[in-house]
Amino acid sequence: SKMKKAVHFGAGNIGRGFIGEILSKNGFDIHFVDTNKSIIDELNNRHSYEIGIASSEHEKISVKAVSGINNSENPEAVIEAIAKADILTTAIGPNVLPYIAELIAKGLQKRKEEKVQSPLDIIACENMIGGSEFLEEKVSDYLSESDKLYLSKFIGFPNAAVDRIVPAQKHKDV
């Protein structure tokens, strides 16, 4: 069976440690997208990484079938990966979401051009309420009406339950 493909924006600790582990457990091949050259190079050299478990000194989880794409150096490869993805996730910080919207839009346009009929869920795993909806708005800014029609048929933006993703933080009411 061919591995399901995930594209994940943000190769930081949450991306690799939490989301990477979940995707890997669920049988996904993971393309990490980040501008951090050293992390991306490392992922491409080793195609796996280890996560230490907080509760145990010895136990480590190994995450395999990973690769990295540097989106500032190689945006075309990101577009290509999105065109073939079965899931797209982010853990880059709410403020950075608008900066990846155009690249995601181009990936969706490529899916449409290639007549990809399989559904794609795009999930913003960010410390914000309604992160995926927010990302959908930003992505839509770059789409034509016919792109949006394609999006409404095949692309989902389910909101993630944020409290499971990052430790609860106390917010003062503004």
Place the predicted regions along the sequence by residue.
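Substrate/ligand-engaging "lid" and interaction regions
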Residues: 3-7, 13-174
